[in-house]
């Protein structure tokens, strides 16, 4: 006990010595007292972002999506200005200049690029045809300028894809919204009708529709829209089933909001992200399907053209004049690839669960 008391007294002495040393080492004059003016101090606030601003920020971080977006913009610009910057019309024929290879000034001096105007045998095809003007993408078997026809075809393919997607959005959103909002027997009947339509092969429906009516761009668009809206309707129906029992919808319903107001003011705006993403995947699907129809010979009628029609025309000349197939096929492939890259980036930006 005596030993413990001695230890305690020693510890107390050390503590008192430390406190004395600390108080002597730090004087009050070492501190500077300043008055704080809250009105002049900068406020540290985080910039608030809404849903669309946050989605745009996420999209910009996705490098592949940015590449797809830039590529799409470039192709769309060339689709509209490409036929204009060339003096040749897309339907103009000159059989004396048929099957000429691509020749682009300046680039024809680069040895490894296929823009020197020489044929498969290494001969100057322009000199043999006595052609004094350059055809940037060459000519086809009828002597039509492939530069103008390629970008005119891209323009028509984009038109078909975008308009078909808009029709799919309109029909699918209306059908899916009604089915998902009302539910019950209405939903059951509408879904059975949808299953019957979906059981019919899409290709057979489109081919029969195109063969019965006069072939045209609008015939192809309407034919693709017969069954193209089914996927959109399922997406919208699922969103409505998820949102119609949410608190903000039930609160508006309790306050006496009409069904029209509930659908178009409260529920539908909250499904726009799913609609945008689905529609962005619909456009390349429609472009590819139109190219397939043109490839089997029931696409856009002559003299109009599309990328699919150009690929079909160039297929017969593949072994002799490969540029007639490779150039439109490359533009078509890049167009669909850029659409899918951009669409995939949109899906990741709109869906927080997909973000890394």
Residues of each region from the PLM?
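Gly/Trp-centered helix-boundary motif
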Residues: 2-169, 173, 317-320, 324-338, ...
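Alpha-helical transmembrane segments of integral membrane proteins
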Residues: 139-356
